[in-house]
A protein has these predicted regions:
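Basic, short loop/linker segments at the boundary and entry of helix-turn-helix/winged-helix-like folds
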Residues: 1-31, 46-50, 55-56, 75-81, ...
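Active-site beta-loop-alpha junctions of metal-dependent nucleic acid enzymes
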Residues: 15, 60, 109-132
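Mobile genetic element proteins and their domesticated derivatives, centered on retroelements
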Residues: 24, 38, 54, 83, ...
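Short conserved beta-strand segments at catalytic cores or DNA/RNA-binding microdomains
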Residues: 32, 90, 94-106, 116, ...
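DNA-recognition alpha helix
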Residues: 34-47
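Short, basic alpha-helical nucleic acid-contact segments in DNA-binding proteins
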Residues: 48, 56-78, 147, 156-158
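Helix-centered, glycine/charged polyanion-binding patches within enzymatic domains
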Residues: 143-207, 211
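C-terminal domain-tail junction helix/linker
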Residues: 189, 198-208, 213-239
């Protein structure tokens, strides 16, 4: 008797195979392709899928894929470089807060509609939650006053922030400004974001792909470890 194929529950009631869904999502967040490009590429493989279906796959599965990859995330260094970059949504500028360590590895990111004190505080809290139990030793900022004030206010909430050295250096922050370029290049090939939620999900996928390229995940020292093609690494992460 043939054994039934065990299907990942996240693909339950989906008409397309999991392999097709994963391929489209992976290619979209990794390469400079539009949804229509991917739909045309699938047709060449004999698979008819609309570009709107691929869009729904990205919005549905990127958060789950990110969660599964994060099980294998390497810890990052405790010296942060923090900066914001502009992202256009519905014709208006929004702000993507990002932090990398001194080696250029991504610490965390957060999309916000504004650039105020509350936005900066929200980012620092999120980045800290990602890094715990390790606290940052140093945080390097640009000259944006709200970010400095946000850290001063956080010190009043939690005295442990007082042990974090805060620096302001445009030279040291060149590292993260260079790192922004990979994200901006991918966004430039899109026709703009139509909603804040869609932008947040898509950007988290782009950031995930960027972290994979930077070698920020480890699958241990087993038979295969971190070797293999990008496809094989994805298969291990999603298993």
């Amino acid at each position: 008797m043939t054994k039934p194929i065990i299907r990942d529950p996240i693909y339950r009631r989906r008409r397309f195979d999991a392999e097709i869904i994963e391929l489209c999502v992976r290619w979209y967040i990794t390469y400079r392709l539009s949804y229509r490009d991917l739909a045309a590429m699938m047709v060449e493989r004999g698979i008819v899928v609309s570009h709107t279906t691929i869009l729904r796959w990205v919005n549905r599965y990127v958060p789950e894929f990110e969660k599964r990859w994060n099980r294998y995330a390497r810890p990052v260094n405790t010296s942060w470089r923090v900066d914001e970059t502009y992202i256009k949504i519905q014709g208006k500028w929004n702000f993507l807060y990002r932090a990398v360590n001194k080696y250029g590895k991504t610490v965390d990111f957060l999309l916000r509609p504004d650039r105020g004190i509350a936005a900066a505080q929200a980012f620092f809290r999120k980045a800290l939650a990602t890094s715990l139990p390790r606290w940052p030793r140093k945080i390097t900022l640009d000259g944006h006053k709200q970010s400095h004030l946000a850290l001063r206010l956080l010190r009043r909430e939690d005295p442990r922030w007082k042990f974090v050295q805060v620096r302001s250096s445009q030279y040291l922050n060149n590292l993260i400004e260079q790192d922004h370029r990979a994200i901006k290049r991918r966004c430039a090939s899109m026709c703009g974001f139509k909603s804040f939620r869609s932008a947040a999900v898509t950007l988290s996928g782009i950031e995930l792909s960027h972290r994979i390229r930077k070698g920020q995940f480890s699958f241990g020292r087993g038979r295969y470890g971190n070797s293999g093609s990008l496809k094989q690494l994805w298969e291990r992460a999603l298993a």
